[in-house]
C-alpha cells in the first residue's frame, strides 16, 4: 500500500464544531446570496453529499472511473482554495441535485446534518484512512476536510459563516 499524501487546506476551513454552531444559529428562512436552492434544500444537498461519502448514495461506474483518473488533481485544486473562493454554480452529480419542487423539512435535515457531523468528526479524530466511493483511499483528514470545505461553501452561500484569512494549512 502506498503512502497517502495529504492535501493542503486553507486556514479558513471551519471545524465540524464551527459548522454545527453556524447551522444551529440559522433557520429555514436564511436568504441565499447566489444559486437557486432554499436553505432547507441546501442542507438536504449537504446531507446527500455526506451520505455519498458514507456510501449511502450509489455512484455510477463511469463517474467512479472518471473520478479516479481526474479526481485527485481536481480535489487538490479545490482544497487549496478557500471555501469563499470556490466557484459558484458548479455542476452537481445528478444524485445530489435538489429538485426545485421539493421542500425539505428544516428540522429533519438539521438533525441529519448534526448526526453526520458527529460521524465525520469521529472519523477525523480516529485518523484511519478512508475509502471514498469516487476517489478511492484517502487520509481521514482529507476525507473530512473535503466535506467541511463543501459544507462551508454552501454555508457561505447563505451567510452562515463569516469570511476569514486564506492561508494554507500544512
Language-model segments: residues:
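Extreme N-terminal tail/first-helix region
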Residues: 1-24
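Short, helix-capping/interhelical loops that line the mouth of catalytic, cofactor-
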Residues: 2-8, 56-108, 112
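Amphipathic, non-membrane alpha-helical segments in soluble helical-bundle scaffolds
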Residues: 9-16, 32, 36-40, 99, ...
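Alpha-helical packing segments of well-folded alpha/beta enzyme cores
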Residues: 19, 46-49, 109-116, 147-150
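Structural signal for well-ordered, non-membrane alpha-helices
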Residues: 20, 24, 50-51, 114-121, ...
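Short hydrophobic/aromatic-rich motifs at helix boundaries and adjacent loops
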Residues: 21-22, 86-89, 122-126
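Short, contiguous alpha-helical
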Residues: 29-83, 125-170
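Conserved, structured core segments of small domains
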Residues: 31, 109, 113-124, 128
Amino acid at each position: 500500500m502506498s503512502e497517502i499524501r495529504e492535501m493542503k487546506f486553507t486556514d479558513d476551513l471551519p471545524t465540524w464544531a464551527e459548522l454545527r454552531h453556524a447551522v444551529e444559529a440559522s433557520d429555514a428562512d436564511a436568504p441565499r446570496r447566489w444559486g437557486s436552492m432554499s436553505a432547507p434544500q441546501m442542507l438536504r444537498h449537504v446531507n446527500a453529499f455526506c451520505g455519498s461519502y458514507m456510501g449511502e448514495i450509489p455512484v455510477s461506474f463511469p463517474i467512479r472511473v472518471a473520478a479516479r483518473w481526474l479526481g485527485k488533481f481536481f480535489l487538490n485544486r479545490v482544497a487549496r482554495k478557500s471555501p469563499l473562493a470556490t466557484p459558484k454554480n458548479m455542476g452537481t452529480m445528478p444524485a445530489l441535485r435538489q429538485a426545485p419542487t421539493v421542500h425539505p423539512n428544516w428540522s429533519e435535515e438539521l438533525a441529519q446534518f448534526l448526526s453526520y457531523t458527529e460521524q465525520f468528526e469521529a472519523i477525523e479524530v480516529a485518523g484511519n484512512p478512508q475509502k471514498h466511493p469516487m476517489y478511492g483511499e484517502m487520509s481521514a483528514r482529507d476525507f473530512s476536510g473535503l466535506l467541511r470545505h463543501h459544507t462551508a461553501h454552501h454555508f457561505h452561500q447563505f451567510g452562515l459563516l463569516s469570511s476569514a484569512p486564506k492561508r494554507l494549512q500544512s
